[in-house]
Amino acid sequence: MTASQKIGLAFRSAIDPYTFGIAFVVAGFSEAQDNGTGFGWGPEGYFKRSGAAYLDAFDGAMIGNGLLPALLHQDPRYFRLGHGTFRHRFLYAVATSFMCKHDNTGKWEPNYSNVGGNIIAGAISNLYYPSQTAGAGQTINNGLIVTFEGTFGGVLQEFWPDISRKLFRKDPTHGLDAQARAADAAAKLKKQQDQNQPQQNQNPK
């Protein structure tokens, strides 16, 4: 991907309805846990929190999925697994918040872009959050929240086709998942046959 493609992808992610929706959810949790200081209570406080949560996510997306990947030559895309056990796929989706592919080698490496971008977004949030909460604690807290949002998004990308097929009888992958599962099953069968072959050769005639 070129630098402009990465920034464009980050912008589309930042204005996706999912990003707005998760900001409203985060704002709801924030208001439920707050003591009434800072943003305050009620509709006004809730919408202030929603706006701040969205800015956190927007900054994290643009910096962690756009600017830093362009500078560090890291691929910000999520590469869906689509087959294997639930546990394996879930852990894979979570890990992609902290691991990514390098542009040139295609090998997995620490996702400095995403982690660094989320921390920077957390630091920027001190500019528009109430002064009572500003500081290192706020930076870390908001950085972790943005990281969790991205992790949840990765899990959703991984399992949404499964959910869609189950609930709506629609396959967003147009059969690619079925092909991947078939290939995975064939590989497991071949591995099992290869393991059994030496045992058969050792049996006396």
Show where each model-derived region lies:
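Membrane-helix boundary connector in multi-pass membrane proteins
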Residues: 126-136
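Mid-length scaffold segments of soluble, non-membrane domains
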Residues: 47-98
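N-terminal targeting leaders of membrane proteins
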Residues: 1-49, 88-107, 129, 145, ...
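Internal alpha-helical transmembrane segments of multi-pass membrane proteins
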Residues: 77-90, 106-115, 135-143
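Hydrophobic alpha-helical membrane-anchor/signal-helix detector
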Residues: 10-31, 51-70, 112-127, 140-157
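Alpha-helical membrane-embedding segments
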Residues: 73-84, 110-124, 172-183
